[in-house]
UniProtKB/Swiss-Prot annotation:
Alphabetically ordered keywords of this record: Cell membrane, Membrane, Repeat, Transmembrane, Transmembrane helix, Transport
Ranges annotated as spanning the membrane: 8-28, 36-56, 79-99, 103-123, 134-154, 163-183, 187-207, 222-242, 255-275, 276-296
The name this protein goes by in its record: Uncharacterized transporter YdeD
Classification via InterPro entries: AA-Vitamin_Transporters, EamA_dom
Gene (name only): ydeD
Family stated for the protein in its record: Belongs to the EamA transporter family.
Alphabetical list of Pfam families matching this protein: EamA (PF00892)
Amino acid sequence: MNTSNRRMGLFYVITGATCWGIGGTVAKKLFQEYQIDVNWLVTTRLLTAGMLLLMLQLFRKDRSQVIEVWKHKASAGQLLIFGLLGMLAVQYTYMASIQHGNAAVATLLQYLSPVIVIIYTLLRKQTVLTKQDIITVVLALVGCFFLLTNGSMSQLSVPAAAVVWGVLSGFAAAFYTLYAVGLLNKFDSLVVVGWAMIIGGFALGFIHPPWQLDFQRLTAEAYAYILFVILFGTMIAFWFFIKSLESLSPKETSLLGSLEPLSAVVTTVVWLKAPFGSFQWIGAICIIGITLILALHKEPSMESEKSILKIRNHANRDI
């Protein structure tokens, strides 16, 4: 893996996580000011973003992959699993945790995913635990905690259902990151993410069809927010996150995903004029620290390269 590929991988995951966080803040404004249903927004953004990604693929040389992925039972089955247990599960479990509790707890529990990814790769003997792994995981958990709670434990007092959904969200995010690798070995990231979004959106559409909304009450501003959530908060965010796995290991990608709550909090402070506490500054420094550690990390050694290849080979066999 050369330095330029690694830099591009860092660019993709940082941009993707940032867009996801900003998109979450914009979505929050839609929920609060326009009373848009969560399930409607998730269904609509998945279906629309998925179709746009596949349309992009049709303008590329390897456009045949859009149909080719469905011609083989193995890849078709993998894509269905990824769309339902990966793409849809990440969205639904996270939203369910918010519904039963609050966004702080939901996000904190979802960011157990880097720990789950590292434990999985250790158990499969696909990597070794390093001092950097321990430092970055601690920084991710501490950083997210301070960012989302400002050091107040009162926000962590939620019903058991919120905790269960939050933990499931963490496992779903880990599965999403690990499972994608096998598909990326065979198909372009546009194809993988595009079809996964359509599968997830179609399944959720049975609960809340995208046409069930009072469109007349929406203003031009609301439509602009919805468009932003679809293009940047969904399409770019998920595509770039998955594409980064072509150049980075799953544990690096999942750790850098902690930029999502940082970008969400910063956007809330700057745009929605929310206060930013002293403990949140500590959290921000922790998250920035992760980015610097991984960005300044030298290009992987041959042993690291082999561990990444092992993950991909195991993923191919397991799925």
